[in-house]
Amino acid sequence: MMSINPIVLLFALLCTLLSPFSIGQSTIIHEQKSLYQDIVVFEHQDFRCLSFTAKKGERVQTCEYQDPQDKRIYFPYVRMTLAGLLFNPKPERILIIGLGGGSVPSALAELYPESHMDIVEIDPVVSQIAERYFYFQPSHNTRVHTGDARVYIKRAGLKGQKYDFILLDAFNGEYIPEHLMTREFLMETKQLLSSSGVLVANTFSTSKLYDHESATYRSVFGEFYNFKIPQESGNRVILSMLIPLPNQQALQQQAEALTSALQPFAIEIENYPSLMTLEADWDEQARLLTDQFSPANLLK
């Protein structure tokens, strides 16, 4: 029987999953196994894409334009995370959990060159690939920490560190590490917020986990904005603060002030406030996710 290279099979599957790209016009330029996942970098027309295949079979794709002068962020769900700037438009200290191709850190570094940024990425291979293939270049104000985010956040809390913008982006499209979803973890993260800081979480909009996750965030942060883009049916962004949340009018005014600065990244920030809601659309009696009860893998 003829044997088939598993990388070829993987590539074919990736091309099938990554709409609107087609199989025949894509080229693998790098593939590598890490301790956590198989990583493939491939090109299609004017895009370069990063795909992960984890040990349990989950997959995620992120793409950037090959032209380093083209700052546009390709995927809407990635652009959505910059909605946090509506709540704190001048963050001086930024914490990002999950690097990927580095689109968001690169955008924030350009927007706020004097701000200090800490990025936590568990997989050192991802950091290497982001720099080699996706133009991610940490500035003198940016530090990439290799390790588990839960450990980093716990240690940062013990040191009394505070951040104005915290992005939880350890989301790969189908899976978030379950120890990064519990009430205990969110309490530890909440302690890192500055008095005017914003928490931004990129997560699911539809799954069996939705009710449990929403109830858990509500138990820790109280009221939060639920931000969904209709055509992005699989994603949502949760936004919350320690202080009372701004109303829709204040968000719209801030969006107008940010529109020009965010245009190069294809972020239509002026459309975001109307897509945010404070209304609960989940079972408010759902059991909270805790370190003792966090079946995230089963509920996805």
UniProtKB/Swiss-Prot annotation:
One GO MF term: thermospermine synthase activity
InterPro entries, sorted: PABS (IPR030374), SAM-dependent_MTases_sf (IPR029063), Spermi_synthase (IPR001045)
Recorded metabolic or biological pathway in which this protein acts: Amine and polyamine biosynthesis; spermidine biosynthesis; spermidine from putrescine: step 1/1
Residues annotated as binding S-methyl-5'-thioadenosine: 37, 121, 148-149
Family from the record: Belongs to the spermidine/spermine synthase family.
NCBIfam families: MFS_SpdSyn (NF037959)
Function: Catalyzes the irreversible transfer of a propylamine group from the amino donor S-adenosylmethioninamine (decarboxy-AdoMet) to putrescine (1,4-diaminobutane) to yield spermidine.
The name this protein goes by in its record: Polyamine aminopropyltransferase
Organism: Vibrio vulnificus (strain YJ016)
